């Protein structure tokens, strides 16, 4: 079985969808293809069931040509189901011509099954997208294995010593701390805790390497 996921949104939204798609793949014995912004490709390739990531500029006001290209990509494989996290007339028009028999969404004329999302923890409430396919979800049980090479790279990047490790992850986004605050924080803590070690994670660090750095900071 093949399942397509149309996944617009930021990195946080992609992370929230991981448990739901992993559950669908496991319980349906399905392979997955995910259409998302190209910047999120490295995240989805960490999920073993994802066989292909389709780059699509959901947030960049895609034109008719973009949608036509996406239609060509999703009509070629024999998808049995689509989890559509996108909204709007264009995506519904594209899906209505896709011949995918089951199309689950919160709204839209192209959906064949409706997902009624209740209030709650976002990863868990996305079970609403899975129920029409007979799939259950316990998002709290979801675990994602990290690549061994990313783990080893993270360990080797840690400063020598046995003191506590402080990870700093400047985002470089509006509202973030100014550079001098990030620079001064380790020194402020080190004045009270001389054995402190610190590592700054670059804002453009691939998500697998960022996750490995956190996992190794015990």
What is each PLM-predicted segment?
Residues 1-218:
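Catalytic machinery of carbohydrate-active enzymes
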């Amino acid at each position: 079985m093949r399942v397509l996921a149309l996944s617009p949104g930021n990195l946080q939204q992609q992370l929230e969808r991981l448990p739901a798609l992993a559950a669908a793949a496991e319980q349906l014995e399905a392979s997955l293809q995910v259409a998302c912004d190209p910047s999120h490709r490295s995240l989805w390739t960490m999920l073993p069931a994802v066989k292909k990531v389709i780059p699509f500029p959901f947030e960049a006001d895609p034109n008719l040509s973009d949608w036509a290209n996406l239609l060509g990509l999703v009509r070629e494989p024999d998808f049995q189901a689509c989890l559509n996290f996108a909204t709007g007339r264009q995506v519904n028009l594209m899906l209505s011509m896709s011949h995918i028999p089951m199309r689950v969404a919160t709204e839209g004329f192209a959906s064949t099954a409706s997902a009624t999302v209740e209030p709650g923890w976002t990863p868990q409430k996305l079970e609403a997208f899975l129920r029409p396919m007979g799939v259950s979800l316990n998002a709290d049980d979801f675990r994602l294995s990290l690549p061994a090479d990313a783990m080893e790279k993270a360990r080797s990047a840690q400063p020598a010593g046995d003191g506590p490790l402080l990870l700093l992850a400047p985002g470089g986004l509006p509202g973030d701390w100014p550079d001098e605050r990030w620079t001064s924080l380790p020194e402020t803590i080190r004045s009270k805790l001389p054995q402190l070690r610190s590592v700054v994670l670059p804002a453009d660090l691939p998500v697998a390497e960022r996750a490995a750095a956190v996992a190794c900071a015990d």
